[in-house]
Swiss-Prot record:
Subcellular location: Endoplasmic reticulum membrane; Endomembrane system
Record InterPro entries: TM41A/B, VTT_dom
Assembly notes: Interacts with VMP1. Interacts with COPA, COPB1, VDAC1 and ERLIN2. Interacts with ATG2A. Interacts with SURF4.
Biased composition regions of type Basic and acidic residues, renumbered to the chain: 1-11
Keywords: Autophagy, Endoplasmic reticulum, Lipid transport, Membrane, Neurogenesis, Phosphoprotein, Transmembrane, Transmembrane helix, Transport
Organism per entry: Rattus norvegicus (Rat)
Protein name as catalogued: Transmembrane protein 41B
């Protein structure tokens, strides 16, 4: 019992003393020489204050919102009714109304519609704003399946990576203050799967064990490399996106987002989640056998 408390205390101290900057972002190897010492010499600068972080976050959000405004302004001239429907969908009715507008202009203004979809999806993912599930369903309605799947996976990977970098830049004070205990527990899991981190990230993206927003903001704090994070996310969101996109082909027959998921699709997702983690399990067993 005492050993367990000591181990947990050690993990907590490590979480505060060795943020993601201790490793080269996007690599899985050791940190660059001198980088670790430099961070330890300036803990206050590394952690930052919650107020400063909030100001930076608001500034970044304002800039991103302005970019979204420019994207919207570059859209073709819309009628009053169409402008009302040009919003982030919150339910299936909103998604249907938005799909109707976008499908009308998709062929004539293909690039503008694609850019608007791309930018909106990444914006929602970056700032952990709900609504991306409806955009995933909408992609199946607007585009051919291969393009829709690639688009959703790319947007999810980029958006989650931007959220990762945002957390790396300004989110650590929030993690330290409000999510330390949960982050420590996940850090222990990450260390156990360090050799198969991509498989583990894929597994987490397929399954609902950890919320996506939690994975995004804590990953840089517990030394998940950005490259591994992006690849794991890009591949991991493919199976659930497959289900959502397939449902989008029958958009106007759906009344809720829950109808996009059947028991059959849940079973398939469970099988894929198991397959994603099997290489790590088998290699661990073989390693134990030969040792």
């Amino acid at each position: 019992m005492a050993k367990g408390r000591v181990a947990e205390r050690s993990q907590t101290e490590m979480l505060h003393s060795t943020p993601a900057g201790d490793r080269a972002v996007g690599t899985q190897g050791s940190a660059a020489p001198g980088n670790k010492d430099h961070l330890k010499e300036k803990p206050c600068v590394e952690a930052g204050s919650a107020r400063t972080s909030l100001l930076i976050l608001v500034s970044i959000f304002s800039c991103a919102a302005f970019v979204m405004f420019l994207v919207y302004k570059n859209f073709p001239q819309l009628s009053e009714e169409e402008r009302v429907n040009m919003k982030v969908p919150r339910d299936m009715d909103d998604a249907k109304a938005l799909g109707k507008v976008l499908s009308k202009y998709k062929d004539t203004f293909y690039v503008q519609v694609l850019v608007a979809y791309f930018a909106t999806y990444i914006f929602l993912q970056t700032f952990a704003i709900p609504g991306s599930i409806f955009l995933s369903i909408l992609s199946g309605f607007l585009y051919p399946f291969p393009l829709a799947l690639f688009l959703v996976c790319l947007c999810s990977g980029l958006g989650a990576s931007f959220c990762y970098m945002l957390s790396y830049l300004v989110g650590r004070p929030v993690v330290y203050k409000y999510l330390t205990e949960k982050a420590v527990k996940w850090s222990q899991q990450v260390e156990r799967h360090r050799e198969h981190l991509i498989n583990y990230i894929i597994f987490l993206r397929i399954t609902p064990f950890l919320p996506n927003w939690f994975i995004n903001i804590t990953s840089p704090v517990i030394n998940v490399p950005l490259k591994v994070f992006f690849i794991g996310t890009f591949l991991g969101v493919a199976p659930p996106s497959f289900v959502a996109i397939k449902a989008g082909t029958t958009l106007y027959q759906l009344t809720t987002a829950g109808e996009a998921v059947s028991w059959n699709s849940v079973f398939i997702l469970m099988i894929l989640a198991l397959l994603s983690i099997l290489p790590a399990i088998f290699q661990k067993k073989l390693k134990q056998k030969f040792e």
